[in-house]
């Protein structure tokens, strides 16, 4: 019996066609399987009823590459936070965020995260491994199937640092664009910034939306919040972002989590405005969602509005992004962290 080289979801249409022929089936069966995987939500060969029954039974053991929903938490705003169990038993987080005109999926790119941002729940659990591209695509398919609605937008803002898994993230982006049919500009890759990685992404000439988690207007404050930033001076990060704009023609979005009394004062806004002067950019202000592991607090509405107004006065495009699904522990890492004792039995220790 011919072995499957990889989970079927990880294979391109040409690869599926080649594989199915090694099992004695005609080439057109590859297209049928491809349609079952991406259009009909099949999770086993048994479900692919227009394929020969004897062949399906003979090859039923071949892996498809779909995760299993371990848990789902639903917030009053209808945001759904999923814990998905992978083939090796590890757990990742995925969030489905519905609105009147779109369905957005927040996907993870790694199991855990090595960045250890001290206000983030995911970083508290450490890094375990990179996700394969099909494990990223599976998250989008799962949300699409659960909501019975086409996914319009995907943001790489879940567990993990996407640029530390760049080859698989790019492969997933290409699949989501070319196979699932989501426009590149509706795909957002977010990073805390890593030396050399932003330029590597720029050289791919993707037309995705690119977001950088900035969170501070100066190097000293930034590296106190993001330990990995000590290896990447803020001035170099901003220079690489300018190079990204020049290479791709796409603006950079800066994400800025507002922490009460830490980085949310008018003086911080003024300093940030000076840093971003003349930059083709947009700033997303994100009021902090408190987690049990750390003592940071959310600013008041007045503080949030004051910070935004300072940036606006300097003619910097700014918006305030209120995280969805807070009641469901849906901010990055929170649901998984809230079940860490149970997950400890499932997750191998490094």
Curated annotation (Swiss-Prot):
[4Fe-4S] cluster binds at residues 113, 117, 120. Its cofactor is [4Fe-4S] cluster. Binds 1 [4Fe-4S] cluster. The cluster is coordinated with 3 cysteines and an exchangeable S-adenosyl-L-methionine. One of its GO terms (molecular function) is tRNA (adenine(37)-C2)-methyltransferase activity. The keyword Amino-acid biosynthesis does not apply. CDD domains: Radical_SAM. The keyword Methyltransferase applies. Residues 99-327 form the Radical SAM core domain. Disulfide bonds join 106-332. InterPro entries: Aldolase_TIM (IPR013785), Methyltransferase_A (IPR040072), RlmN_N (IPR048641), RNA_MTrfase_RlmN (IPR027492), rRNA_lsu_MTrfase_RlmN/Cfr (IPR004383), rSAM (IPR007197). S-adenosyl-L-methionine binds at residues 160-161, 190, 213-215, 289. It comes from the Bacteria. The active site is at 93 (proton acceptor), 332 (s-methylcysteine intermediate). It is found in: Cytoplasm. Specifically methylates position 2 of adenine 2503 in 23S rRNA and position 2 of adenine 37 in tRNAs. This is Probable dual-specificity RNA methyltransferase RlmN. It comes from Synechocystis sp. (strain ATCC 27184 / PCC 6803 / Kazusa). The gene is rlmN.
